[in-house]
Amino acid sequence: KTLDVMKNVGYDKVLEEENVNFVDMNYGPYTELVLNHSIIKSTPINNILNEADVIISFTQLKMHEEATITASIKNIAMGWPPAEIHGYPKKKTGIHEDLHGFISSIMNQIPIDLSIVSCDKAMIGTGPTDGIPVDNDGLIIVGTDPVAVDTVGARFLGFLPQAVAYLYKLYNDGIGEAKIENIDLKGIDISKAEKIFSKNAYGKAVVLDNKNIKDIHGTQPK
């Protein structure tokens, strides 16, 4: 459970030292969130949803055996629905019968104001557990559009948006931008970032676009 993990890694001491108010999203008080999902029509969400001025998603980039990737969107979509209701892990109420649909339906209702995806210690292989850690010192993706941020993260793992069903659905829903050519990228060049990640992950530098930026469906300009 969350508090056990916090104690095991020493975060409870940090909270005490910094005088931070910790909220465990697995418990109430709740507000009911209506969802456009094939199985789960609504879910309780901690009242912090209506009290927070800004919602920040901070997580590490991982491959995931069902969700394809874990980045800023899945971090909130699967982290906020309470385990008290959906189970430990959250497989009691039908979420995993349509996982991508659940993630997209949650993110149509919960805005992420700032997405921070650390690639400093990423994971490839069989996530969410037993994967292979990848060290990319100082490599981080930050932005105010969670779809754009996760699109870049997906590219590091070798996926275009449609390979991550919930990401492509959210793009089509107008929640954010998934066309790399329309994303305002700052910092290092996207191809350089992909080379850094792939070299550390696989021992060989691989660039998804191979000279020219592919469009959202993988077609390169002539």
Predicted feature descriptions by range:
Residues 1-222:
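N-terminal and secondary-structure boundary signal
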